[in-house]
Regions:
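Extended beta-strand/beta-hairpin segments
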Residues: 1-53, 60-141
Length: 141
């Protein structure tokens, strides 16, 4: 198996502070994040969008594997993961993730596609990691 890493730096307080996110691959290298990008829609990244990107990528790769096992190959798949962060008690929690998949898969019928997409949603490693409500809207186009 593999082990990889991501890292974060932070300077200052919660509202005036500035952070930087990096990944081992270099895909992100000191990319800015902070309170304003997380809660006020300002430029920069935030943990929730990174979790969304990771979940969308993991789910889509898992579905590719599951499709292959069913002798199907996607011509194209596009997945979006909407991650909801809500205030709970004294803190915050990710309360749900909604996956939206649009896929072009020659030879797939909707019933089989829905079954395989559901397996990918339940079985991808990021889904297994997350302790939240995960929903899926999968469409063949």
């Amino acid at each position: 198996m593999t082990t990889t890493s991501g890292s974060a730096k932070w300077q200052g307080g919660i509202k005036d502070g500035k952070g930087a996110i990096s990944t081992k691959s270099g895909a992100l290298n000191d990319y800015p994040y902070g309170f304003a990008s997380r809660f006020e829609g300002k430029a920069g990244s935030n943990p929730e969008e990174l979790i969304g990107a990771a979940h969308a990528a993991c789910f889509t790769m898992a579905l590719s594997l599951i499709l292959g096992e069913a002798k199907l190959t996607a011509e194209q798949m596009e997945t979006r993961a909407d991650v909801t962060l809500e205030k709970q008690g004294d803190g915050f929690a990710i309360t749900s993730i909604h996956l939206t998949l649009n896929a072009k898969i020659p030879g797939a019928d909707d019933a089989k596609f829905q079954e395989l997409a559901g397996k990918a949603k339940a079985g991808c490693p990021v889904s297994k990691l997350l302790n939240t409500n995960i929903t899926l809207d999968a469409k063949l186009v």
